[in-house]
Amino acid sequence: MAAAAPDKAVERLSQKLVHPSSPTPSAPLRLSWLDRYPTQMALIESLHVFKPDPARDAAGQGLAPARAIETALARALVEYYPLAGRLAVSRDSGELQVDCCGGAGGHGGVWFIEAAVPCRLEDVDYLEYPLAISKDELLPHPRPRPTRDEEDKLILLVQVTTFACGGFVVGFRFSHAVADGPGAAQFMGAVGELARGGERITVAPSWGRDAVPDPAGAMVGALPEPAGASRLEYLAIDISADYINHFKSQFAAATGGARCSAFEVLIAKAWQSRTRAAAFDPSTPINLSFAMNARPLLLPRGGAGFYGNCYYIMRVASTAGRVATASVTDVVRMIREGKKRLPSEFARWAAGEMAGVDPYQITSDYRTLLVSDWTRLGFAEVDYGWGPPGHVVPLTNLDYIATCILVKPWAHKPGARLITQCVTPDRVTAFHDAMVDIN
């Protein structure tokens, strides 16, 4: 008789609002222009998969995952107290701010949900795509469900789901209005530091929103529009270190020994492969957009401790014909030239000299590819006492915006993983074939 299929049902064990473990300030806090940008009004969702630690479990060391993380979360919120607050509109300025109401007795707090699954992580392929368990079962959704207005005010929600093997998944929903990627990872790292027994957080958080420019008359473009946009297909591709080194070597040979990054190589290859697969007319204008960290341009010590939004969207423009027929080395050159413009272009934007152009605008135009590098944010280094995550799963609810996310591969093997949603279903095979072709 065939073995019964493993039970993958998620049981919610508890939900609560976690408050800072000590008293915290209650005065409202101003958000920067970039924090208040319309597309930041979203909860960014991700799953972080942690393998079991048999030696730790056998020795009975420490708390179980949910208890360890909940306890550390309450301690971390003493210094990161704005994350326990709520987004609100200032009565004075009419602008979005943080109402620091997360202290005990306040109406804030971080939603924390504990759940369990009776199967092992390996029974669900460690949550490789396609997910064997619905993402919404692993992400924190309080019950009863908040109204849209209530959810729009939330800043942070956490769920820890433990599996029968001792492994666990941490699901985060984090307001982009309060933290960008490096900022969110910084906070998660602080929770991990305390969960591992640390007495205090090594890098003290800094609010510091006044350092971020608020340009007079800064343009805010239209929001991405799903109407009329194509549905784009998900595809994850694991890339070997040999693959990356092959193209790095080509670049070095063509440039007299110059070096380029894995990000530059992989994004160049992805942009070219997508352009070829999409079969654009050669004269079609196409764009590559990617966020660059602006902390070194604005903040002392490179912005250590700052966790608000501090980035700039760089754009590389070309034609489909040029990108499709160029060598990967030449596409890398285009990207590197775009990156060099960061200091001057950011300075122009900060001075209000962009002449009606919104550099932060995200578009659903199929001709634009939006790429993100998650390998340098810090998520892959977060450790709650069981070691760093086996892998991190970025989640997107917008299947009409062409995206490509670079993450670290499973269990930190050499190489990288590309998580893409950038071509229509009928073009996925062509895109995949172009990506794996190293000629």
From Swiss-Prot:
Residues 1-25 are annotated as: Disordered. The active site is at H176 (proton acceptor), D383 (proton acceptor). It comes from the Eukaryota. The keyword DNA-binding does not apply. InterPro entries: CAT-like_dom_sf, Plant_acyltransferase. Disruption phenotype: No visible phenotype under normal growth conditions, but mutant plants have significant reduction of ferulate in leaf cell wall. It is an enzyme of class 2 (transferase). Its EC number is 2.3.1.-. Involved in the incorporation of ferulate into the cell wall. May act as arabinoxylan feruloyl transferase. Belongs to the plant acyltransferase family. This is Acyl transferase 7. It comes from Oryza sativa subsp. japonica (Rice). The lineage of its organism: Eukaryota, Viridiplantae, Streptophyta, Embryophyta, Tracheophyta. The gene is AT7.
